Amino acid sequence: MTTSHQQVHVGPRDGSRYQPVIALVNTGSTYAVMPSPMLSMLGIDPYWTGMVELGPGGSEERSFAEIRLRIGDAECTVVCVFGQQDSQPVLGSHTLQAFGLQVDTATGGLVPARAFLP
């Protein structure tokens, strides 16, 4: 697992407005996680619920939605888990793959990833 931080802009699927945040890039997490109050402020409502495995162990049901993210000049719609009120924003492996990015383990920065096909 590799971690670093990245400035991103978070918005609803229609891209009508964005909130800048510094997100933890965590390749051990599957999806993006954003604090629920921030998502609500942006007008993002949960679309579905599902079970998630928690880092310290155990699992719980959480709400999910699709959000619009901007990283640099690139924009993409990704799956996001509604975090707790004080959750740190997180970019997970699914988010990085959607943007075609990976973590450069030497620098901790995000770099283009090679896509693999069967």
Each model region followed by its residue ranges:
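Pepsin/retropepsin-fold aspartyl endopeptidases
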Residues: 1-118
